[in-house]
Amino acid sequence: MTLNVVLLLGGRSTEHDASLHSYRRLRAALESAPGRITLHAVAYITREGGYRHFDTAPWPDTEDELRAGTDLPLHEALSRLTDGDAFVFSLLHGNEGEDGAWQGIAEVLALRGNFGPVLASALGMDKRLQAVVARDLVPGLRTPRTWMAPPSLARDPEALEQWAAEVAGLLDGRPAVVKPNRMGASLLTRVLPDPTGPALARATAAALPYDSQVLVQEYVPGTEYTCGVVRTGGRTTALPVVQAVTEHGFLGHREKHEHGLVQPLLHTTDTGTTRRVKQASVRLFDEMEVFGFARLDFLVHDDDLYFLEINTLPGLMHGSAFPRMLDAAGLDLVDLVEECAAEYGRRSVRDKALPYLIGHPAEETTAELEHSGV
């Protein structure tokens, strides 16, 4: 039976462009498999939060074409997504896409799609908290030393300078990485070889308008690895690990998105290191109850395995690591969509109706409450 799919893309997010690129590649893959999947509709959220809907081919390709679609109010857009038996495959990267926002909408509306649990996505967008969870779940797993700038610093430049000076003293001349806590794609992430107080303050101030939580981490030199994980046939499977080789030893936004700045080394045969990466990835994926698929990033330094972050909706664009890992495992993007739809059918559904017995009187007077000491 052919699977009907709605592609949901765009979003009011700093990763809007990544969503458009993932959409184009996935749409092309789905159109190449007409006997397996039917593209039922395209739902686009503009950068400003408007909703556009397309239910017939030819499907939009450019952002101008997407913006020219039927403009819908929110309630009607949600109604169309929940109407019928189509599976909604979300490509909403970043804020308001994979941070728990749309996952909550999907839970409340029983929206059939690859959204998954609220907590897994919310945790997946919070680098500081997921590091705490990861260390607890995987014995021996390390994370870089981290300091978080208090949100109030965005309104107090003097306090920001004082905080930055204190962190610079704790770093004691060691290089640092400054990054937003709740953004993806390494946006606004900077390496500071000489993290003086003023340098830390400037880098933190640049990120604060986009995220009220900014992290300063001690830079750990080493080799970066990324591991994809998918649910196939009801089982959690680690994909072949990719080692990221860069000229400057750091995998930032430019390295991830400009051709030739990173040399991905695909490990089709496991080593001791890649086995450790896979084991940690599967454990974290399962324990965090991530839905469908994810990508997890690690770093190895002096034989110590450092956890960097989990991405609960990795990019599917050309040049992204996740499709490369899928291909090495004998899978493609059409398989991924089909597996997500099958996994949705296998998910556990909580019973939310339970008798809640209350033995107190229906109404109590003020005098009775005062007498009882409440």
What are the language-model segments listed below?
Residues 193-279, 300, 304-306:
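Phosphate-binding site of ATP-dependent enzymes
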Residues 2-9, 78, 123-215, 221:
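Active-site nucleotide/adenylate-binding loops and adjacent lid/helix of ATP-dependent enzymes
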Residues 111, 139-141, 290, 331:
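Helix N-cap/coil-helix junction residues
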Residues 106, 130-134, 326:
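Structural element of the ATP-grasp superfamily
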Residues 3, 271-374:
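ATP-dependent carboxylate activation and anion-phosphoryl transfer catalytic cores
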Residues 1-119, 123-125, 129, 150-162, ...:
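ATP-binding N-terminal substructure of ATP-dependent carboxylate-amine bond-forming enzymes
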Residues 104-112, 194-198, 329-331:
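A glycine- and small-aliphatic-rich helix-loop capping segment at beta-alpha/alpha-beta transitions
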Residues 59-60, 233, 314:
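Short, surface-exposed beta-strand-loop junctions and turns on beta-sheet-rich folds
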